[in-house]
UniProtKB/Swiss-Prot annotation:
The lineage of its organism: Eukaryota, Fungi, Dikarya, Ascomycota, Taphrinomycotina. ATP binds at residues 173-180. Keywords: ATP-binding, Nucleotide-binding, Proteasome. This is Probable 26S proteasome subunit rpt4. It comes from Schizosaccharomyces pombe (strain 972 / ATCC 24843). GO terms for molecular function: ATP binding; ATP hydrolysis activity; proteasome-activating activity. InterPro entries: 26S_Proteasome_ATPase, AAA+_ATPase, AAA_lid_3, ATPase_AAA_core, ATPase_AAA_CS, NA-bd_OB-fold, P-loop_NTPase, Prot_ATP_ID_OB_2nd.
Length: 388
């Protein structure tokens, strides 16, 4: 072998070694990067274990570009500085901050305090409901979407015409006609934040607590816009005010006054809307019903023949059936019933099928169930619902 060939072979072997060491170096660099990450994480964990807790305070006033007056959670007020990495433009009156234990320097900005009751309202899931699953209320759905959906999705339409969009809507009518179902359909179709409020749960035995929950509820809604607040059974706190009464009645009246104040404080083109529901509209306070607070009142009546047929078809859609179903006969037999009664008819028909050891429903099951529900309706009292 010539000297040239020997040198060439050596060059090739060195080149292969170089590539091999180069790939090993890359692997080591990647391993080193992972080790550095683990080291930094361990350092942070050690610091967090060794670090001292911080005091929670509230900003009262900014004195100059570097100093703030802060009220600590324990009560006293201090003039303090601020860390360089804290955005001072967010340090306005009322903002919660954490303070260093020794120097009382503002360390970070904290989110606003949320009452657990309000937080539980916000995690209420409206469910997988669409307007297609609400039968016999086409006109009411149109009116509700005009008030709630249109201002949230197309506020420029109202600016163009020069009118102010409504703030809220009242749904009233007999029990079981679909008031809560409509509100859930609105929340599910819009995909916005949704606060489900049971009005009776707001009332607290301690003076001022109910009004505080109302304030926190509206404050949370404004911070998480767009938001829809649904207040069910509003007659629990929205009843007509009177001069006599116990201390509990006066507390409910204070709660109502706070609610009226919060509704008046809305920005018209704000992204917070209210839906209220009741089956006793005659007991509500006139101040709550006036335009500017509840601009539109939508009556949810008992379904007519067309509505009852739509509701029955919706409830029977996923039910195993055999033979032809005579919907017209069912509709005539269920005169004066509401949507909840019609759902009960389908459930009772299912029970009859189970008793007879069948896995499907037939026409006679539905007719028997409709007669049973009609007999039970005679036990219920009636209220004459006047248009508001």
């Amino acid at each position: 072998m010539s000297e040239r060939d020997t040198a060439l072979e050596k060059y090739k072997s060195y080149l292969l070694q170089h590539r091999e060491w180069d790939s090993k170096l890359k692997d080591l660099r990647f391993g080193n990067r992972d080790l550095v990450k683990k080291y930094d994480k361990t350092e942070d964990d050690i610091k967090s274990l060794q670090s001292v807790g911080q005091i929670i305070g509230e900003v009262l006033k900014q004195l100059d570009s570097e100093r703030f007056i802060v009220k600590a959670s324990s009560g006293p007020r201090y003039v303090v500085g601020c860390r360089n990495n804290v955005d001072q433009s967010h340090l306005v009156q009322g903002v919660r901050v954490s303070l260093d234990m020794t120097t009382l320097t503002i360390m970070r900005i904290l989110p606003r305090e949320v009452d657990p009751l309000v937080y539980n309202m916000s995690i209420e899931d409206p469910g997988d409901i669409s307007f297609a699953g609400v039968g016999g209320l086409n006109e009411q759905i149109r009116e509700l979407r005009e008030v709630i959906e249109l201002p949230l999705k197309n506020p420029e339409l109202f600016l163009r015409v020069g009118i102010k969009p409504p703030k809220g809507v009242l749904l009233y009518g007999p029990p079981g006609t679909g008031k809560t179902l409509l509100a859930r359909a609105v929340a599910a179709s819009l995909g916005v934040n949704f606060l489900k409020v049971v009005s009776s749960a707001i009332v607290d035995k301690y003076i001022g607590e109910s009004a505080r929950i109302i304030r926190e509820m509206f404050g949370y809604a404004k911070e998480h816009e767009p938001c829809v607040i649904f207040m069910d059974e509003i007659d629990a706190i929205g009843g007509r005010r009177f001069s006599e009464g116990t201390s509990a009645d006066r507390e409910i009246q204070r709660t109502l006054m706070e609610l009226l104040n919060q509704m008046d404080g809305f920005d018209y083109l704000g992204q917070t809307k209210i839906i209220m529901a009741t089956n006793r509209p005659d007991t509500l306070d006139p101040a709550l019903l006036r335009p500017g607070r509840l601009d539109r009142k939508i009556e949810i009546p008992l379904p007519n023949e067309v509505g009852r047929m739509e509701i029955l078809k919706i409830h029977l859609e996923k039910v195993s059936k055999q033979g032809e179903i005579d919907y017209e006969a069912l509709v005539k037999l269920t005169d004066g019933t509401n949507g909840a009664d019609l759902r009960n008819v389908v459930t009772e028909a299912g029970f009859i099928a189970i008793k007879e050891d069948r896995d499907y429903v037939i026409q006679s099951d539905l007719m028997s169930a409709a007669r049973k529900v009609a007999d039970l309706k005679k036990l219920e009292g009636t209220i004459d619902y006047q248009k508001l």
